[in-house]
Amino acid sequence: MTISLRAATVQFQHRASDKNYNLSIIERFIAQAAEQQVQLLAFPEMCITGYWHVRHLSDAEVRALAEPIAASPSLARIRPLAERYNMAIGVGLIELGDDGRCYNAYAVCLPDGALHVHRKLHAFEHPAIASGDRYTVFDTPWGVRVGVLICWDNNLVENVRATALLGAEVLMAPHQTGGTHSRSPHGMKPIPQALWQRRAEDPQAIEAAFRGEHGRGWLMRWLPSRAHDNGLFLLFSNGVGRDDDEVRT
C-alpha cells in the first residue's frame, strides 16, 4: 500500500457552455501537474460545461451540453492524459445517462483506463438535471481508496460518513461555491461583482472577500470536520471568479 500520495487541486474560471475552451485550460493544468509528479488531480464541479448559467437554459439546451459517458468526446481528451502521465484525473460535466436523464456528474479517469463516475446526490441546478442515487468509492493503482461527493453532497454529514464506511481514505470534493445566494440566514451571501472586476486595481479587497464569511470563512466552519470526523483526507476543488450572477471563491 502506498503511504504517500501526491495530490493537487485546480481552480480556474470556466466559460459558460464553452467546452472546448474549458478543456484547453484543463489540459494545460494536467500537463503542469505532470511536471510536478502529481498522482491525483481534482478539477471543479461541472468545469467542462460551466455551471451556474445552466439554470437559464431550456431542457433541450441542457441535453445538448450533456454527453454519454461511454462515448464522451470530452473524456476522450482526458483519459489518454491519465494514462500518459500515470495520474488519476477528476473532471465535472453533465452526463446523459443510459436512462435518458441528465446528471451533474464527476468522472475520475485512472491511468489503467478505468473510469469511475459519481452523480451528484442532491442536484438543484436545473429541473432537467436529475439526482444520483448511490455513493461512489473505488480503488486506485496506489492502494488508496477514493470517494467522490459533489458540492452540496458534502454539506450533509451522513453522505461523508457513508462514503467513509465504504472504505474511502481520500474524498474528492469538487465544488462551485462561494458568494452564493443562500436562502439560509446563516449561509453565505453574494460577493459584489465589482470587487472581482477591480481585482487588478484592488487585490486586497477581493482577497478579503474570498477569505471572509461568504467564501473560505464559511467553508472552514464545517468542511474540515468532514475529514476529521471520518478519518480521511479531503481534496477540495472550486471554481473562481464570475459565474453568471455569483462570484466563486
Which stretches of residues belong to each language-model region?
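CN hydrolase (nitrilase-like) catalytic-core segments centered on the catalytic cysteine
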Residues: 70, 74-88, 155-249
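Beta-strand-turn-beta hairpins that frame and shape the catalytic cleft
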Residues: 1-7, 137-147, 168-170
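Active-site beta-strand/loop signature of hydrolases that rely on acidic residues for catalysis
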Residues: 7, 22, 33-57, 82, ...
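N-terminal phosphate-binding loop and adjacent alpha-helix
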Residues: 11-30
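Short, basic, glycine/proline-bearing loop/turn elements
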Residues: 10-17, 58-66, 143-146, 202-211
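Short, hinge-like loop/turn segments at secondary-structure boundaries
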Residues: 58-61, 106-111, 189-191
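Catalytic-core segment of enzymes that process non-peptidic bonds
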Residues: 64-149, 153, 228-249
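Glycine-rich phosphate/pyrophosphate-binding beta-alpha loops
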Residues: 15, 151-156
